[in-house]
Structures are given as C-alpha cells and as structure tokens.
C-alpha cells in the first residue's frame, strides 16, 4: 500500500514536471539567433564572443554606449589607452547631452503657424589667434580648406566605402536586393471563383454597386461598395481584350 501523501500527489491535477521554456535562456531573456543571416553565419567564429565577432565583422551589436566591462589595453608607456567616442552611440543620459551642447545664444527657425522650433541654426563663430580672427575649423586661414571639403563631399560612394569590411558590403548588397524585390512585388491576380462571383453580381445588378453591397445572398461577406467597384474594374481590365 502506498502512502497517503503519495496518493494525493498522483490524484492532483498539477503537472509533475514543469514544461520547458522554448526560446528562453535561464535568466528569462529571449534567446536571439545571431546566425539567422547566411552571410553572418558563414563568417562567424564560434571561438569568439558575440562582441568580438561583431567587432571583427565591422558590426555593432548595441547602439548604446558601453557602461562598463570593456577592455582597455595599456600602451607602451604603461598608460591606459582612451578609445575615441563612436559618433553612432546613443547617449542615454540627459546630462551627457547637456554637456555636449555649448552654452550661449543661437538662432532658431520656427514654424510660422505653430511657433514651434523646427531647427537650430548654429553659426561657426570666429576665434582670435595672434590678433587675427579665424574659424576653429581653419585656424591657419588656408584658402584651400573649403575646396578640400567640397572634394571630399563629391567623392564617389565606392571610394568612401573602402573602409567598410567585406561582410558589411555583402549585407548592404543583400538589403538592397531585398528592397528592390519588395518594390517589384507582383500584383494579385483574381481567382476563377472570384471572377465567377463578379460575373453573377453583374448579371443580377448590372452597374448598381449599392445593390451589390446590400445583396446578402451573393455578397455574404458584406464587401463594401468601393471594394466591389475596384474588383469589377480590375475584372473588366482583364477581360477587355
């Protein structure tokens, strides 16, 4: 004879074993398939961590700036090398963005109707060096400085993308091809049953679309008058020849 407690457990409706959580880690976070893309899976190194793989491939796994845990390599002098700030990182605190903005007066452009600020116009103020006023971006007052900036802006995109890794270029080409495929989506063709249904509506009501919309026998799904017009217009275009 079994024990009373064991018999109660057997009669209980609670499951004996908890169901496995599919697609979740032990911490409760959702498991992300980083190898979902064929190009990334082909160039992925399983011996490296996610951050190391993304850095090697030229990708970014987080847009936010790192809050800690990043390794800073010492230089030959023994000092800690300060990594340059990535302009793509999103500042998470309002204090950091307030420090970045310079205090002072500036011009703004407002909406004439609502009065809201559309954009801030920041003029590059001149600074005085050795008794001469020059721009901060051109302290030597070089006349060829503006020409070099214009040449850099006119530089073709193929030359500017040389710094990108081969994986990033492949991903960009793949995204471009997918975008073109979405734009070139084929139109929906009417089925034979839909064409027969439209013919029955026309035989009974002719051009009276409002009567078609109210017909509960031939239009049981209560398609609207405008929807019926579009379907019949498409049907006539296909059978006009």
Swiss-Prot record:
<feature type="compositionally biased region" description="Polar residues">
    <location>
        <begin position="156"/>
        <end position="172"/>
    </location>
</feature>
<feature type="compositionally biased region" description="Basic residues">
    <location>
        <begin position="230"/>
        <end position="241"/>
    </location>
</feature>
<dbReference type="GO" id="GO:0042273">
    <property type="term" value="P:ribosomal large subunit biogenesis"/>
</dbReference>
<feature type="region of interest" description="Disordered">
    <location>
        <begin position="130"/>
        <end position="193"/>
    </location>
</feature>
<comment type="function">
    <text>Involved in the biogenesis of the 60S ribosomal subunit.</text>
</comment>
<feature type="compositionally biased region" description="Basic residues">
    <location>
        <begin position="182"/>
        <end position="191"/>
    </location>
</feature>
<keyword id="KW-0539">Nucleus</keyword>
<protein>
    <recommendedName>
        <fullName>Nucleolar protein 16</fullName>
    </recommendedName>
</protein>
<dbReference type="GO" id="GO:0005730">
    <property type="term" value="C:nucleolus"/>
</dbReference>
<comment type="subunit">
    <text>Component of the pre-66S ribosomal particle.</text>
</comment>
<feature type="compositionally biased region" description="Basic and acidic residues">
    <location>
        <begin position="70"/>
        <end position="86"/>
    </location>
</feature>
<keyword id="KW-0687">Ribonucleoprotein</keyword>
<dbReference type="GO" id="GO:0030687">
    <property type="term" value="C:preribosome, large subunit precursor"/>
</dbReference>
<dbReference type="Pfam" id="PF09420">
    <property type="entry name" value="Nop16"/>
</dbReference>
<feature type="region of interest" description="Disordered">
    <location>
        <begin position="92"/>
        <end position="111"/>
    </location>
</feature>
<keyword id="KW-0690">Ribosome biogenesis</keyword>
<comment type="similarity">
    <text>Belongs to the NOP16 family.</text>
</comment>
<dbReference type="InterPro" id="IPR019002">
    <property type="entry name" value="Ribosome_biogenesis_Nop16"/>
</dbReference>
<feature type="region of interest" description="Disordered">
    <location>
        <begin position="1"/>
        <end position="30"/>
    </location>
</feature>
<feature type="compositionally biased region" description="Low complexity">
    <location>
        <begin position="93"/>
        <end position="102"/>
    </location>
</feature>
<dbReference type="GO" id="GO:0006364">
    <property type="term" value="P:rRNA processing"/>
</dbReference>
<feature type="region of interest" description="Disordered">
    <location>
        <begin position="64"/>
        <end position="86"/>
    </location>
</feature>
<keyword id="KW-0698">rRNA processing</keyword>
<feature type="region of interest" description="Disordered">
    <location>
        <begin position="211"/>
        <end position="241"/>
    </location>
</feature>
